[in-house]
A protein has these predicted regions:
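Bacterial signal peptide processing site
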Residues: 21-23
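Short active-site neighborhood of thiol/selenol oxidoreductases, capturing the structured segment around
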Residues: 31-49, 153
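Short, thiol/selenol-centered motifs that function as redox-active sites or metal-ligating centers
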Residues: 42-51, 75-76, 170-175
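Structural microenvironment flanking redox-active thiols in thiol-disulfide oxidoreductases
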Residues: 49-88, 99-106
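Thiol-/selenol-based redox modules, centered on thioredoxin-like
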Residues: 119, 124-125, 129-175
């Protein structure tokens, strides 16, 4: 089942968001007709820190075709704190600041690190966990057996149906 974002609202929201490279100007990188991955981030969330390597690997594997963006909602984190997080974990991710939670609310995002894979028509093809490493908060699996986002990206590339379009995100609450 695809979740269709209201394109008008999506574009209006994106017009108000700001980028990490110049937080005083609107970020228009997402206002295009291409697929994209949005990762809800919080620099203090231990799970966001744990998944930085996975984000980098996915960006290496898919980033030429499908751009990745980090989304930092609210005003709790300064651009300096976000930049420090990106540098500490060597994460080459463009950041979209969402100070008024507009994008967060449009996506119905509640958790970091929650991921959204959105196609060129702004349909949400996948949302939720990166993988099944966490069975629940505080309980980790010994072995990952499901790579939800990676599998969704692979399916998209070959035009196949995405087997698992949604999982329940586990992590830190967006504040």
């Amino acid at each position: 089942m695809l979740i269709k974002l209201n394109q008008f609202i999506f574009f209006v929201i994106l017009g108000f968001l700001t980028s990490c490279s110049n937080p005083t100007e609107p970020h228009y990188a997402l206002i295009n007709n291409s697929a994209k991955v949005l990762v809800m981030l919080s620099p203090d969330c231990p799970l966001c820190k744990n998944y930085t390597k996975d984000i980098s690997e996915l960006m290496t594997a898919f980033g030429d075709e499908i751009p990745f963006y980090g989304v930092v909602s609210g005003t709790f984190y300064s651009t300096l704190e976000v930049d420090s997080f990106l540098q500490s974990y060597k994460l080459p991710l463009d950041i979209i600041y969402d100070p008024d939670f507009l994008l967060c609310n449009q996506l119905d995002a509640t958790i970091t690190p929650e991921v959204f894979f959105i196609d060129e028509n702004n349909d949400i093809l996948y949302s939720g966990l990166f993988d099944n490493w966490l069975g629940e908060l505080g309980r980790r699996r010994s072995f990952i057996t499901e790579y939800y986002l990676k599998d969704a990206l692979k399916a998209y590339q070959i035009g196949a149906t995405i087997k698992t379009p949604k999982t329940k995100a586990i992590g830190c609450f967006i504040e």
